[in-house]
Amino acid sequence: MPKLKTHRGLAKRIKISGSGKYLRKKAGKSHLLSGKSRKRKRNLKKTVVVDATNVKAVKKLLPYL
């Protein structure tokens, strides 16, 4: 069986925490920011844990990470 390939696009967007959780950045902070409140933009900066429903897909796309 051939080696599994890592999904390079996802590998650049996801980091793994020390406890093994997958971390990602929030979407929506690149442009069209003038209509968003200060609080909303501040909250978009934060890193969040990948939702449990998506963890299986992430593990499949990142077999060696």
Curated annotation (Swiss-Prot):
PROSITE patterns per record: RIBOSOMAL_L35
GO cellular component: large ribosomal subunit
Biological-process GO terms, alphabetical: translation
SUPFAM superfamilies: L35p-like (SSF143034)
Pfam families: Ribosomal_L35p (PF01632)
TM stretches of this protein: none
InterPro entries xrefs: Ribosomal_bL35 (IPR001706), Ribosomal_bL35-like (IPR021137), Ribosomal_bL35_CS (IPR018265), Ribosomal_bL35_sf (IPR037229)
Protein name: Large ribosomal subunit protein bL35
Gene encoding the protein: rpmI
